[in-house]
Regions:
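N-terminal pre-Walker A segment at the start of P-loop NTPase domains
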Residues: 1-36
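Interdomain motor-coupling "hinge/lid" segment immediately C-terminal to the ATP-binding subdomain
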Residues: 2-8, 154-263
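Hydrophobic anchor at the beta1->P-loop junction of P-loop NTPases
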Residues: 47
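Conserved glycine(s) of the Walker
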Residues: 54
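Hydrophobic positions on the alpha1 helix immediately C-terminal to the Walker A/P-loop
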Residues: 58
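Accessory nucleic acid-recognition modules appended to NTPase machines
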Residues: 75, 219-367
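Short glycine-rich substrate-engagement loop in P-loop NTPases that contacts/grips substrate
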Residues: 77-110
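Structural recognition of the conserved hydrophobic beta-strand(s) that form the central parallel beta-sheet
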Residues: 116, 140-146, 167
Length: 367
């Protein structure tokens, strides 16, 4: 028999939740590819990225596109597991959601269903239930999550080659301009006034960054919120997940790393500075923490170009923040701050366009 709370959440989505969000949604440029026709054994499409980067809204955009293509609303089940009314979760919670949906819309079992599970990692053993559903039901599944249990390396492990991961970064400059309605009705070439408007918008973007939730805040509010994003990511997705013993060191290392976005980065130098300050966990642990930052989508490491896969990590490297706004929120004001924010934005745009191959973006210091 249908769970009343689950049934209410399922029905409320199409009645009130989706219409309300569509009114203020800004289209993202990340493509999730052509939707698979519902069938057993489909690959799961997983949207990964840093917390607060807009993953849920990207699911809403996909749902809107499906509806516009002629898919019936009763063939779409979108469910957010981050709801206190669902707690405590059990091993059967995901099954209850699916069975309740089919009780509400029986024909969807044979016609095929598009499942959108948001924050699915809140449910214990979610991966076991998700794999079984994918193998046995006529469905197409989209999944997203933002906790330490839903990071990029976990996706490959949980679905074992049966998923496609899509990385969603905060707003690009194009998306930022779209959000702020900068020259959205432009046609033809830019005149001088339009060029000036774009230059001003670009400068603002490099300082404010592209996290959707901070776009309408003033400078002080935005800096505080962005700092909280970074601190919470370190606490949940790095310290808690990996069990690093010194949380204060990890927080400070995150601040130093993000503030160094676009600069040469040295593990040895960090180790030396830490020892001078009275504590260092050692180079190996520092390197492991930096890797954990990258896995949590807090920053990215870029190494010097080499033809040898074995030597990728032997040369120098730089780190780039997940968003130029993080650099400006965490770094002290310096003469090269805007320049490094621009370099960070360029790297992130290259990342949006590049393949996922190791070394597809590299440093070339000497020509």
């Amino acid at each position: 028999m249908a769970n009343a709370t689950i049934a209410t959440l399922i029905e409320d989505f199409h009645a009130t939740v989706l219409p309300a969000h569509l009114k203020r949604m800004v289209d993202r440029d990340l493509s999730l590819g052509t939707p698979f026709d519902p069938a057993p054994g489909n690959l799961v499409k997983v949207v990964v990225g840093m917390r607060r980067s807009g993953k849920t809204y990207r699911l809403f955009q996909q749902i809107r596109d499906l509806l516009n293509s002629g898919i019936k609303p009763e063939q779409i089940c979108c469910f957010n597991f981050d709801d206190d009314r669902l707690r405590p979760f059990t091993a059967s919670t995901i099954d209850e959601v699916l069975e309740t949906f089919f009780e509400l819309h029986p024909s969807s079992r044979s016609q095929g269903t598009f499942l959108f599970f948001d924050e699915i990692q809140e449910v214990p053993n979610w991966d076991i239930a998700a794999r079984r559903i994918v193998d046995t039901e006529k469905i197409t599944m989209y999944v997203t999550g933002s906790s330490s249990r839903m990071l990029s390396t976990d996706v490959a492990t949980e679905f074992r080659g049966r998923s496609i991961a899509y990385e969603l970064l905060p707003f690009s400059f194009r998306e930022y301009a779209r959000y702020h309605h900068v020259l959205e009705d432009r046609q033809g070439m830019f005149d001088k006034e339009q060029q000036s408007l774009l230059k001003r918008a670009c400068r603002d973007y490099l300082v404010q960054g592209g996290f959707p939730g901070v776009q309408m805040l003033d400078d002080n509010e935005r800096a505080g919120v962005l700092q909280s994003y970074a601190q919470f990511t370190v606490a949940r997705d790095v310290v808690e997940r990996h069990g690093f013993s010194n949380a204060a060191f990890a927080r400070n290392l995150a601040r130093v790393s993000l503030a160094s976005s676009g600069r040469d980065f040295s593990i040895s130098k960090i180790d030396g500075m830490s020892r001078s300050a009275g504590y260092s966990p050692g180079r190996a642990t520092i390197s492991a923490i930096i890797d954990a930052f990258e896995d949590a989508h807090l920053l990215h490491q870029v190494y010097e170009f080499t033809h040898s896969a074995q030597k990728v990590r032997l040369g120098g490297f730089k780190v780039y923040a997940e968003d130029p706004g993080l650099l400006c929120a965490l770094a002290p004001a310096t003469s090269d701050g805007l320049t490094r924010a621009l370099e960070t934005a360029v790297y992130l745009e290259m990342r949006r366009r590049a393949s996922s191959r190791v070394g597809s973006i590299a440093l070339l210091k000497h020509i």
